Amino acid sequence: MGKTLYQNKTLYQKLYDAHIVYEAPNETPLLYIDRHLVHEVTSPQAFDGLRAMGRPVRQPGKTFATMDHNVSTQTKDINASGEMARIQMQELIKNCAEFGVSLYDLNHPFQGIVHVIGPEQGMTLPGMTIVCGDSHTATHGAFGSLAFGIGTSEVEHVLATQTLKQGRAKTMKIEVNGEVGPGITAKDIVLAIIGKTGSAGGTGHVVEFCGSAIEALSMEGRMTLCNMAIEMGAKAGLVAPDDTTFNYLKGRQFAPTGEQWEQGVAYWRTLKSDADAKFDTVVTLDAADIAPQVTWGTNPGQVIAVNQIIPAPESFSDPVERASAEKALAYMDLRPGIKLTEVAIDKVFIGSCTNSRIEDLRAAAAVAQGRKVASGVQAIVVPGSGPVKAQAEAEGLDKIFIEAGFEWRLPGCSMCLAMNNDRLEPGERCASTSNRNFEGRQGRGGRTHLVSPAMAAAAAVSGHFADVRDLSAATH
């Protein structure tokens, strides 16, 4: 692994090149896949394809499955979310048993959102290629792994061969330097980035996040960042592994031990972009300029600081952006020129693969403590996994939420997407810690505003959007 192999390479190029199995002239290279994560929604047809051709799962020990999208967060009853959900979950149980794949089902203590359980169990390691039939697989890039979402036909290909054809992407460096102010989180950083690049600014690229503000983030913050790389159109997001990464991983169930751990860390330290590496695109931000962010429109790029006014469509010079803003304002039932702090909410959702880890729940609980959810607001807190739920309860966070009037739920994807019982009714407005604010994402006619966990809790206790910096407990 000498320097000569890696001269002038970005982290992405190192990861990509290390996994090429075969590359013929004028053909898309074939990459080896180290880890394959599976859930109940995008896998049934893939397993059916294997069965029809009489193929086994090539390396079942590198494949892990869980139930998350369809599950009820109020009961562990497989029938609770409707017939389609029941069928998909039962199919996953059958397929995993038949093909020898490890499954974290509803009764398993590790069950949870696939992009939460992978890292917390140490399945996600630096230097790996990781795929899942889910667009937010980019989350795992926080560990310096090349992780991206795939379609169901590709799920079948990986199950059958442990490989995937994958073309080279362009490279983008997003550098955030300086220190963020009090109350500013990774969610605010990534929303500010998407606000600058636009929701298609990263199209065709793999993004590497770097700079002193990124290095200062915990692994949980870095996961939030990489989770939303897809929301700027990127194929994947990356953060170079460092001591923060290694300290997080050490001792986790699937992490290496002993001499293998030492060898792993020695290799992982080489996984960074060379000083002379060239990126196709470079974006820079000053961390000190970032305020708490709230989306106002129907894509994550339509975002402003909480203390700014909702923009008028005429303020956009690009005609496509102007038309998009007009449509978004109409759908969201918002008027240009008003402050977001004047906008009342109906529901609050704290959860999702973006923000349902223990640090997210601690940040929200710090705001909720000693306060009450505003009259007429329904607020739910959905931990990302069984271990997150257990840790939160050991710390007494569940009691803080319940006392404040929040609902404390079981793990699952929940209100991030309208595939289970947690959804918005037409016209309802939600402060959500999830990653997508598209029309109907949380339920037909629902209006989604993306915020950090602390900002979501602030909205819950205020009844409208509020600057978390104005609430004294935000100095947790």
Curated annotation (Swiss-Prot):
Alphabetized GO MF terms: 3-isopropylmalate dehydratase activity; 4 iron, 4 sulfur cluster binding; metal ion binding
Catalytic activity entry: (2R,3S)-3-isopropylmalate = (2S)-2-isopropylmalate
Cofactor: how bound: Binds 1 [4Fe-4S] cluster per subunit.
Gene Ontology biological process terms, A to Z: L-leucine biosynthetic process
Pathway assigned in UniProt: Amino-acid biosynthesis; L-leucine biosynthesis; L-leucine from 3-methyl-2-oxobutanoate: step 2/4
Pfam families linked: Aconitase
Superkingdom to which the source organism belongs: Bacteria
Entry annotated with the keyword Electron transport: no
Cofactor(s) demanded: [4Fe-4S] cluster
UniProt KW keywords: 4Fe-4S, Amino-acid biosynthesis, Branched-chain amino acid biosynthesis, Iron, Iron-sulfur, Leucine biosynthesis, Lyase, Metal-binding
Keyword NAD: no
Biological role: Catalyzes the isomerization between 2-isopropylmalate and 3-isopropylmalate, via the formation of 2-isopropylmaleate.
Sequence similarity: Belongs to the aconitase/IPM isomerase family. LeuC type 1 subfamily.
Protein name per the record: 3-isopropylmalate dehydratase large subunit
Source organism (scientific name): Yersinia enterocolitica serotype O:8 / biotype 1B (strain NCTC 13174 / 8081)
